[in-house]
C-alpha cells in the first residue's frame, strides 16, 4: 500500500531508503535491513533492465547507510546505543538530544544523495516506469493474530528498555510464543552470524584483560574517546568496540557518538552492514566487489561529514 502511494522510480527509492532510516529507530538497524533490502531487490528486478542495473547496488548501499544512521537516534536503534545507554544510566531523552544533530544531518545527506543519483539515472519514459512499479501487486493477506501478538511482545520489550520490567519476562514470553505459534522461524535464525558475534565478544573480552593492551588503550583514549571509538569500530565493529572501550572510560556520551559514527566506514564497522552484503552475494556473487566499492566510498563520505559535524559541535 505504501508503494502504491508513490509516483515513479525515484519516489519508490526514496520511500525504501526513508523506511530504513526511520523504522531502524524502533525496530533496530538489523531488522530494518532484513525487512526492506529484500523488498528493494524485488522492486529493482521489476524495473526496466537498464534502470534496474543502475539502482541495484546503489539502493542497497543507501538502505544500509540509512539504517545505520537512523538507528543512532534512539536507545533501541542499535545494540551499542542500548548497552551504553544502560551503562551510563542516561534517559532516553538525553540520548536523543545528543544524537539529534547527527541524525538530522544524515537525513539531509541521504535525500541529497538520492536526488544526485536520480539525476544520473538512465531515462525511462514515465508511463513505462509507472506501469512497472504499479505491477508490484504481490501482496499476502496480513495475519492479524501474528500482528497483534508481535506488537504486544514488542511493547513488553520496550518496557524492558525503559527499565520498567526485567529482561527475563520478554525473553521467556517471546521464546514460548515462538515455540508454540511460529516454530519454523527459529530455524531461520542466522546462527552463523550469532556465532560470529559470540566469538568476537569473547575475543574482545580476553583482549581487554591483557595488561599491556589495557595500559596502551588507556593512554590513547585519554581525551580522544570519540575518535578512538570511530577507529576501533573499523577493525572490530562498533558493538564490540563499545563493550571494550567502556571498560576504560566513563565518558559514555563520547563513546555513543564515536561508535555510531564508527558504524560507517568498513564493511565490518557495523555488523548490520553484513546483512546487506549477504543479500547481494546471494543475488549475484560476481557483484560483491563492485558493491563493496560503492558501499565503502559512500560510507567514507558520510563519515567525513559526521566527523566534521562532531568537531563543530565539540
Predicted segments with their positions:
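Membrane-interfacial loop-to-helix junctions in multi-pass transporters
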Residues: 3-18, 47-59, 144-148, 215-228, ...
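Small-residue-rich segments of transmembrane alpha-helices in multi-pass membrane proteins
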Residues: 8-20, 63-72, 131-138, 194-208, ...
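Membrane-interface alpha-helices at helix entry/exit sites of multi-pass transporters
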Residues: 10-15, 48-62, 90-100, 251-263, ...
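Hydrophobic alpha-helical transmembrane segments
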Residues: 10-18, 32, 60-61, 96, ...
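Hydrophobic transmembrane alpha-helices that form the pore/transport pathway of multi-pass ion
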Residues: 16-72, 83, 243-256, 285, ...
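Short helix-coil transition sites and intra-membrane helix breaks within transmembrane domains
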Residues: 23-35, 70-78, 230-246, 262-271
